[in-house]
């Protein structure tokens, strides 16, 4: 992985003339550096959502996989869709892990950042699931005042 990153950086530097300023890069070098960045397929939003819903809907998911999945999901530069959070909350319920369910809601609020309209929308969309599963929001528990 590191070697691939170094190759991309070296190819990009060579294309800009930083490694060998005396000679101009050939058109083939420029094409090569562009192609290095475009390998693999790009996942659509629907495919991304379906992948995570499927991950959290696994009937044999354990607590470690739940935490690993949420940690990975939180690492992305996005607020998860309500259907992904719904699947994660249902996984928490299957595992009887109330603390993780509340933590997921806290993380969603944190990921929304300064966009104050996102978290209320997510809670509104999740309200039927929260009521069905008996999960309280951090605000209902008073955790937002701590």
Curated annotation (Swiss-Prot):
The modification N6-acetyllysine is found at residues 83, 109. The modification Phosphothreonine is found at residue 137. One of its GO terms (biological process) is mitochondrial electron transport, cytochrome c to oxygen. Residues 1-37 form a transit peptide. Pfam families: COX5A (PF02284). Keywords: Acetylation, Heme, Iron, Membrane, Metal-binding, Mitochondrion, Mitochondrion inner membrane, Phosphoprotein, Transit peptide, Ubl conjugation. It is a peripheral membrane protein. GO terms for cellular component: mitochondrial inner membrane; mitochondrion; myelin sheath; respiratory chain complex IV. A motif (SIFI-degron) lies at residues 2-16. SUPFAM superfamilies: Cytochrome c oxidase subunit E (SSF48479). InterPro entries: Cyt_c_oxidase_su5A/6, Cyt_c_oxidase_su5A/6_sf. In response to mitochondrial stress, the precursor protein is ubiquitinated by the SIFI complex in the cytoplasm before mitochondrial import, leading to its degradation. Within the SIFI complex, UBR4 initiates ubiquitin chain that are further elongated or branched by KCMF1. It is found in: Mitochondrion inner membrane. Pathway: Energy metabolism; oxidative phosphorylation. CDD domains: Cyt_c_Oxidase_Va. GO terms for molecular function: cytochrome-c oxidase activity; metal ion binding. Disulfide bonds: none annotated. Belongs to the cytochrome c oxidase subunit 5A family. Component of the cytochrome c oxidase (complex IV, CIV), a multisubunit enzyme composed of 14 subunits. The complex is composed of a catalytic core of 3 subunits MT-CO1, MT-CO2 and MT-CO3, encoded in the mitochondrial DNA, and 11 supernumerary subunits COX4I, COX5A, COX5B, COX6A, COX6B, COX6C, COX7A, COX7B, COX7C, COX8 and NDUFA4, which are encoded in the nuclear genome. Component of the cytochrome c oxidase, the last enzyme in the mitochondrial electron transport chain which drives oxidative phosphorylation. The respiratory chain contains 3 multisubunit complexes succinate dehydrogenase (complex II, CII), ubiquinol-cytochrome c oxidoreductase (cytochrome b-c1 complex, complex III, CIII) and cytochrome c oxidase (complex IV, CIV), that cooperate to transfer electrons derived from NADH and succinate to molecular oxygen, creating an electrochemical gradient over the inner membrane that drives transmembrane transport and the ATP synthase. This is Cytochrome c oxidase subunit 5A, mitochondrial. The lineage of its organism: Eukaryota, Metazoa, Chordata, Craniata, Vertebrata.
């Amino acid at each position: 992985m590191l070697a691939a990153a170094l190759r991309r950086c070296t190819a990009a530097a060579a294309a800009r003339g930083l490694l060998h300023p005396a000679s101009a890069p050939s058109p083939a070098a420029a094409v090569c550096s562009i192609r290095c960045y475009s390998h693999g397929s790009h996942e659509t939003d629907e495919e991304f959502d379906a992948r995570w819903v499927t991950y959290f809907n696994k009937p044999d998911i354990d607590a470690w996989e739940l935490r690993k999945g949420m940690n990975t999901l939180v690492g992305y530069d996005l607020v998860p869709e309500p259907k992904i959070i719904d699947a994660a909350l249902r996984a928490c319920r299957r595992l009887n892990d109330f603390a993780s369910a509340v933590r997921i809601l806290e993380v969603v609020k944190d990921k929304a950042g300064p966009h104050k309209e996102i978290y209320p929308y997510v809670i509104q969309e999740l309200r039927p699931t929260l009521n069905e599963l008996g999960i309280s929001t951090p605000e209902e528990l008073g955790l937002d005042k701590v």
